[in-house]
Amino acid sequence: MGKLALAAKITHVPSMYLSELPGKNHGCRQGAIDGHKEIGKRCREMGVDTIIVFDTHWLVNSAYHINCADHFQGVYTSNELPHFIRDMTYDYDGNPELGQLIADEAVKLGVRAKAHNIPSLKLEYGTLVPMRYMNSDKHFKVVSIS
């Protein structure tokens, strides 16, 4: 199925989106935005086809859950900070095969994990904010893990 090409611990602060909008915070997170764009550029140069995000804002009560629908599309408003992120559109392809493979391999190792290919299961901002900048051209497929 491929190989791990790049790993990064990154920010996903909602103020990155707020930084795009007119007002007193315009440009406040430009450094982080530029960094995300650079990660996307490096991934393209390495031939990456899918970005996997471990999303700390996808809250679950048990196990690891892998959101690997065929496609993610919608308009997102943060329940946590609706004054920072509201009406943010997104549209990305998913990678159900990779998501299922991750779950299967995790279970073999004794990790409680489950893959979900559910069209109504949406992405959270811990995935959406990085994808907005790393994947603005929709080059990469997306898998989100809780």
Where do the PLM segments sit?
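Soluble secreted/lumenal catalytic domains
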Residues: 1-146
